[in-house]
């Protein structure tokens, strides 16, 4: 599912950027992406960049400490340079003391009432307070994991192969194992199917290597891009009915309760 979610995130951020560029005024769009303890999906936003657009201009992951003052400094520089700025942030960004940015009363309304919310909304209030320019936050939320119309063919292929490998493991008497894919090469993209004891991965977070985050803590490296690109490759044909994406019959999941 990661490759498909990454594909949706990168595509959506590119579309948000194109929409933003229409307006000739200084603006900031903060996109909050899933990732409480690991920033892989937020890192995937880098794939939105092309020869016409550098969005997202800033990327913040939870693997490194987030500094609000440095964020405002970074943002000022980007607004001065590009006018319209797109920022990608993980929902789980924390300060140097390990406190979630979204858990602080970063801003209060004019009556002094704390406005507590997610990381994106918290930073939106901060930008309004410090810069006073047009700013909005967008919480991608559940959309990033259910956009079936924008699935990655690589992702789908690997899902089926993983399922087949799981059957082989079961037939061989293996149990409490998770199918895993071990990358052999980025280009050409090659990997091998293996398995890992569930006890080694359950309730664990596989963090982004800090070496794949730039020293200034607001972007990712070429190594990250090389890792991500193969995972979003390929398009899955989508069926449509009456102009709307049409999926499997899930009537067995849509019971009517209370009757």
Question: Where in the sequence are the language-model features?
Answer:
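Accessory alpha-helical/coil subdomains and C-terminal extensions
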Residues: 1-136
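C-terminal non-catalytic interaction/assembly regions of soluble proteins
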Residues: 100-259
